[in-house]
């Protein structure tokens, strides 16, 4: 009997060890995560990849910027997190069209699934596994709120492997379009270029991109997702449906809050004010400006 992989079985990455899938299957089955074992190796490899980037960041950053060595330990930690965030956003931006093409072929918006889309979401899940590790390890610096955020993000992604609501994943991946500009804004702050012409141009692009993908497109998709959930409220477990509704609204409300903070920060930087905002947006929605 042929063991060739059919197109429907072909993922973004080669399939992982069957032994790993069989090892995690009983746990996944307990929560109805029937598609998760197939992608567990991608999650683990992704988390390892981002940890390697985090380890390499101090070495690379010292060569690229003389400012890095002068930063406090807390600020270097945050700098490295922004480096990892930048890499993650570029990866997801590059895969965005592929993911959109995959989900548009789903016959069912609620329970649609493909191996390729599952692998792309697994890359994101791996990032949040890494993020959870970092926020727990440095909870005295990041605060408990970021630990909770990492857990919530992992929960949302993980339970898409029932499968459930994978169709709407590209909306949240598209949010990463604003992340490179946001991280550039952060790096300019930390290299004494606050209020520079470059930062103002970048800030303008950041605001426009953020409003387009996270506010306009984000809220439209939030409405579409909510309608889909409510129209099938008795099909999926009600607790899961309510959680996704709450998470969906919370993330989009946070985006409104963050964009107001960003506009205020850019306005003050345009006037050369040195005082930093209490909160600064990142790809995880808020990193302390330390």
From Swiss-Prot:
Provide the protein's localization: Endoplasmic reticulum membrane
- What domain of life does the native source organism fall in? Eukaryota
Query: Does the record bear Disulfide bond in its keywords?
Result: no
Which Gene Ontology CC terms are recorded?
A: endoplasmic reticulum; endoplasmic reticulum membrane
Q: Where is the TLC domain?
A: 74-271
Question: Where do transmembrane segments lie in this chain?
Answer: 40-60, 80-100, 110-130, 139-159, 166-188, 200-220, 238-260
Q: Which Pfam families match?
A: TRAM_LAG1_CLN8
The principal location of this protein is endoplasmic reticulum
Membrane topology, as annotated, equals: Multi-pass membrane protein
Q: Which UniProt keywords apply?
A: Endoplasmic reticulum, Membrane, Transmembrane, Transmembrane helix
Gene Ontology annotations of biological process type: lipid homeostasis; plasma membrane organization
Protein's recorded name: Uncharacterized TLC domain-containing protein C17A2.02c
